[in-house]
Amino acid sequence: MNQKKPPVSKPPSKFAQWLSRASGSLWLRTVKIVAGILLVVLLVFYSAAALFTDQGGFTVSIKDAGKGNAKYGAISLSETADFASPTVRLEAQEVARMTNISELDIPADVDNYDGAHNGANYMAYTFYLKNSGEAACDVLTDLRIDGVVKEADEAVRVRVYKNGVPTTYAKLAADGTPEPGTTPFEGGKKVLSELSEDLAPGEITKYTIVIWLEGNDPECLDNIKGGSVKMSLMFSVVEDSETQSET
């Protein structure tokens, strides 16, 4: 019985060789392109993550605490409405690495939590102010910027909830007009100065402070990468002439 000879393999044609080399070269170029795209994406992500490194600090305090007339000047702070641990100074947690967001990214219920409840890209802090004295008093609220690096305050937003009512503050735009939906800073490094009159004995005011970097602000540019903002909120009892005569 005759056996068939095994087929003789023919060497690949020149076209097949060229096609093989072309396919390998195309695959290599594709890999390089994909790797390049991934590198760009990672660099963009890193730049965004480093946009607002070490955001700064935020403190709340009472001016000249303990130096005034205890009857009229006794106001205190607490992170809880029951004032289980009253104090004259509070400090919010910092946001270590903060990138720009939109105000639409702020949760609708951000005012519903006590103490520090930061998001990934915003600072949120809720506390309470109480008149612990024996008579009504006027309280001055002074919110100011204590330090800025790389002009980060140009695009910062500060939203203050007072008993659930929000007001958003921002620096004036480059053309001198208010940023949309905001109340301008009072000037310089002062964000706001507000007098609350006739705070009754035992009356409690709830505050929530939210701070973020507004990505829709035209001033939110690359030059503020790595910037920071440090702010403080101070309360003080304003004594009228009658009160001063009694002290």
What are these regions (language model features)?
Residues 2-106, 116, 239-247:
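Short, polar/proline-rich extracytoplasmic segments that appear immediately after membrane translocation
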Residues 21-35, 101-112, 166-204:
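Extracellular adhesion/glycan-binding regions together with long Ser/Thr-
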Residues 55, 153-155, 226-232:
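Short edge beta-strand segments in beta-sheet-rich domains
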Residues 105-137, 189-247:
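C-terminal, structured domain-capping segment
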Residues 135-145, 152-155:
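Short, hydrophobic/aromatic beta-strand segments
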Residues 141, 157-161, 239-244:
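Short C-terminal domain-edge/linker segments immediately following a structured domain
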Residues 143-147, 234-236:
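Acidic (Asp/Glu-rich), glycine- and aromatic
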